[in-house]
Amino acid sequence: DGVFIFDVHSTYKTDTVFPGYSYHENAEEFAMVWDSYADDAPHSVVHELTFFLQDEDGRFTRYDEVHEERTYEVLTYDILLEQAGFKSFKLYADFEDKKPRKKSERWFFVCQK
């Protein structure tokens, strides 16, 4: 018996918000570039991040990261949770105690074993 809580990006976010997303920040001691692209698999995205961090001697060191993310339809999570032995779950969205809407960006699952 127990509760399992997790969150994922919604399909709306992976399919509509992230593709073409770009964020850049420039401060005195660091700079950051974040670009996102749709990936080949359904509801998947690639984030390319580049950081420039200032060292003690004043020079900047570059760090690159690639993050690949994928989400699924709620029905897929439902099936997988049932296969894992969970009896029920409640679904919330966007850090609120509300059901997801069409343009919700993050889903929160509260699952009962």
Language model: regions and residue ranges:
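C-terminal lobe and adjacent flexible extensions of AdoMet/dcAdoMet transferase-like proteins
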Residues: E68-K113
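Glycine-centered, small-residue-biased loops immediately flanking beta-strands
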Residues: G2
